[in-house]
Amino acid sequence: MARATPIERYRNIGISAHIDAGKTTTTERILFYTGVNHKIGEVHDGAATMDWMEQEQERGITITSAATTCFWSGMGKQFQPHRVNIIDTPGHVDFTIEVERSMRVLDGAVMVYCAVGGVQPQSETVWRQANKYKVPRIAFINKMDRTGANFLRAVEQIKTRLKGHAVPLQLPIGAEENFKGVIDLVKMKAINWNEADQGVTFEYEDIPAELLPEAQKWHQHLVESAAEASEDLMEKYLGGEEFTELELKAALRDLALRNEIVLVTCGSAFKNKGVQAMLDAVIEYLPSPTDVPAIAGQLEDGTPAERHPTDDEPFSALAFKIATDPFVGNLTFFRCYSGVVNSGDFVLNSVKDKRERVGRIVQMHANKREEIKEVRAGDIAAAIGLKDVTTGDTLCVESAPIILERMEFPEPVISVAVEPKTKADQEKMGLALGRLAQEDPSFRVWTDEESSQTIIAGMGELHLEIIVDRMRREFKVEANVGKPQVAYRETVRNEVKDIQGKHAKQSGGRGQYGHVVIDLFPLEEGAGYTFTNDIKGGVIPGEFIPGVDKGIREQLKSGPLAGYPVVDVGVRLHFGSYHDVDSSELAFKIAASMAFKSGFMQAKPVLLEPVMKVEVETPEDYMGDVIGDLNRRRGIIEGMEDGPSGKLVRALVPLAEMFGYATDLRSATQGRASYSMEFGKYAETPNNIAQAVIEARQSK
C-alpha cells in the first residue's frame, strides 16, 4: 500500500496547558473544524470527545493522553491536506508523567494559556519538559472573551516566567465581551469569523483604523525577529527592503524549528474564534517528522545508532502509553520512527528481548477507533494484542534490533495502604493494580513485608485517589484506603572507616565463615549507592565479592534507622579474611550486612523527607493567613509576586505537612485561593520530627 500523505505533510503535536486554560475545548474545536466531529462537545456538559474516561468527564479535567488523527487543508483551503496527529496532554501536576511521555514522541507543541490567568505555575513544568526534549512550540492565548483578558500581558509572562522569546503572530481585535476576531500580522489583515456557521467560514478585512498603529508596531517586531534567521535577511532588512510574505513565513518557520522563537496566536475556542488560524500556524510553523533530528538509540552491543523517518529503513517504534480498553484489552500507543509495520507482523521488544505479534492496528479518534492495515514512519497508532510491552519499550524488526532512548520516570513521593473490602476482591485487586501499574510507570505497587499490606505509591494525593477510583469503576473492586504515608529516605552525614563485620558459625560439620572490613561514606545528593572493591592480595577471593555487594544492597531496601530506603551512601571494601572450607557467598553476604548496619548507625544517620514546591494564588486580603499557615507547616517562603487574580506565593513545604491542605486552604480563603504542588527535593528532617517518625515505625 502506498503512503496516503507524504511525511513532509505530517504534524505530530501535543496540546498542553494548565488546568482550565481551555485545552480540551481547544482540541474539541480542532476536531470540529478538521471535520471529524460534527457536533461540538462542550466540557461543561461532560460531552467532550477527548476526555473519554468517566472520571475526566466528572472532574472536567483530562487524565488520559488520547491520540487523535485529523486532516487540515487550511482555513482558506490554501494547503494540500496535512495529517495532524494530536496527543492531548493533562495539565494537572499529578499527571506530569503523562505530559513527559507525550513530549517524548511529539515533534511540536501548542501551549494553551488563559488570557486572564496567563502563565500559571503548572505551565512552567510543562515548558521545562518541552525544553528537555527540545520540542518547537507555538502559543495560543485562549479565552480572549473572558473578563480580565489581556493578550499582551500573557505574551510578556511567556518572556519573564518561561524565558521564552515570544513573538506575536496576531493581535486580538477587542477583548472580553467585545472580542471580535484577530489581526494577522503577516498579511496585515483582520480576520473575521462567521458566527452563523460556528466559525467555519471567514473573511479578510481591513484592519480597523484605531488598531492600525498598534498593528504596524507589532508587524515591525515580527519583521525584526524574522531578520535574525539569516545574514542575507538581516542585510535585506538593514537595507530597508520589504520581505515578501513567503520570505517572512520561511524565516519565522526556520526560527521556530530552531526553538529560537515562540510564535503567539490568540482567540476564544469557546466562541469559535482563533482556533482555525492557530491550526494554520501549526502547519506553517511546526515541524514535520523530517524537520526534527533522527531518533537516537543503541544497538545490541551498545554502539550508538539512529533511525531516520523514511519507509525504507528498518521498522522502529516507541511505545509511549498503555491503555486498558473494556472491549479489546490492552491498547499500546506507539510512534513509528522508521520503516513500516503491518497488522499480523512479528516484532521484537528489544528492551525485554521478547518477540511479539502485532494483532490489529487501530488509529484512534479520541475514543472511536478505525482499524488500519499498516503504520508508516512518522505516524502514531495503537496496537492490539501486544502482551508484554510497557511504556518506554522499543519495538523493532528482529533483523535490525535497536533500543531507542529510554524515558526516565520519577520515584513516587506518597504512598497509602489499600485493602479490598471483601476477601473475594483480593485477587481482583491484585490484577487491577497490576494492570494500572503497567499503564502508568509513575505508579508503584508492592506488599509491605512486615504488615503484609498492599501499598500503592504515586506522585500526589490526586494521583492515588484516581487510581482507587479507577479500581472501583473499571475493575469493580471496592477498597479501603489507609492514611497517606510519606516516602522518607535514610542517609549518613559522616564517614566511618574500618568497620568490621564477622560471621562465624561452628556447629559440627561444615561451618560458615565470612569477615569483611569496610569504609562507609556519604555521597552527593542523587548519587544513589556505589560499591568499590579495594581488596589487595586476595585476602577475600573474587568469587565472594558479589556476596558482599548483595548483602549491602539488601540492607539498602530497609535502612537501620527506621526501615526506610537508604540513599546516597558509598561503601569501600578493603580488607577481610576467609576460611578455605567454611567460607561461602552467603557467609560474606551476612558479614557485609552486619558491617553495614553497624557502620551506618555510627556515621551520623539522618532521615530525609520529600519537600514540595508549592505555589498558592490568593486574593490579597488572605495573603497574611496563607503565609502564616505555610510557616506553621514548616514552609520556607521563596518569593511572592503579583498573579493574575491576586498574589502568587512560592514556598518549599515538607510533604508530611501538606496532607489535607486543599481543604484547609479552601476554608481559610472561602474557596478563593488555589494551589499547585510538585516534588522539589529530599531534605533532612528536623530532629524532633525525625525522632517521632522513627519511634512510630519502631512501635509498629
UniProtKB/Swiss-Prot annotation:
Q: Which InterPro entries match?
A: EFG_II (IPR041095), EFG_III (IPR009022), EFG_III/V (IPR035647), EFG_IV (IPR047872), EFG_V (IPR035649), EFG_V-like (IPR000640), EFTu-like_2 (IPR004161), G_TR_CS (IPR031157)
Q: Does the keyword GTP-binding apply?
A: yes
- Judging by the UniProt lineage, the source's domain of life is Bacteria
Q: Which SMART domains match?
A: EFG_C, EFG_IV
Classify the main location.
cytoplasm
Q: Which residues form the tr-type G domain?
A: 8-290
Where does this protein hold GTP? Answer: 17-24, 88-92, 142-145
| Cellular localisation | Cytoplasm
One of the entry's Gene Ontology molecular-function terms is: guanosine tetraphosphate binding
UniProt similarity note: Belongs to the TRAFAC class translation factor GTPase superfamily. Classic translation factor GTPase family. EF-G/EF-2 subfamily.
Q: What does this protein do?
A: Catalyzes the GTP-dependent ribosomal translocation step during translation elongation. During this step, the ribosome changes from the pre-translocational (PRE) to the post-translocational (POST) state as the newly formed A-site-bound peptidyl-tRNA and P-site-bound deacylated tRNA move to the P and E sites, respectively. Catalyzes the coordinated movement of the two tRNA molecules, the mRNA and conformational changes in the ribosome.
Recorded protein name is Elongation factor G
Recorded source organism is: Tolumonas auensis (strain DSM 9187 / NBRC 110442 / TA 4)
The coding gene here is fusA
